[in-house]
């Protein structure tokens, strides 16, 4: 995440915090990557109303997946209310990353020189970008900074309906 707080620590998001060294290796590899982080995934949310609507119009072959998503949403919302005091929806973290790989126009990106803090007690897993005129030595990494969240949710749901 560039501008948001973390979701597993004050500064780190789960997919980076679980293995910051691996993430830093990817960032420094020179590969052409786009990071779809909390800056955009927290703004792209699936609601139970979306799943209720899908239940009424999904393809028969998709019924088991939609039923599973409804059950998972109930479980997710219960845990999220307990831990984070959030209610009513589910950020589309990994689904949005996959959708952006297929449809990059869902997001606007910015390139920044970036590294991942691999040590530290409080900042382990934090993505560090250097915006100074002469930034530290690092590769440019593309970060999703804006998202068309309504379009993303519609595109996700369109896979399931007839």
Question: What residue ranges belong to the model's regions?
Answer:
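Active-site glycine-rich loop that binds ribose-phosphate moieties when present
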Residues: 1-28
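Conformational coupling and interaction surfaces
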Residues: 14-17, 33-162
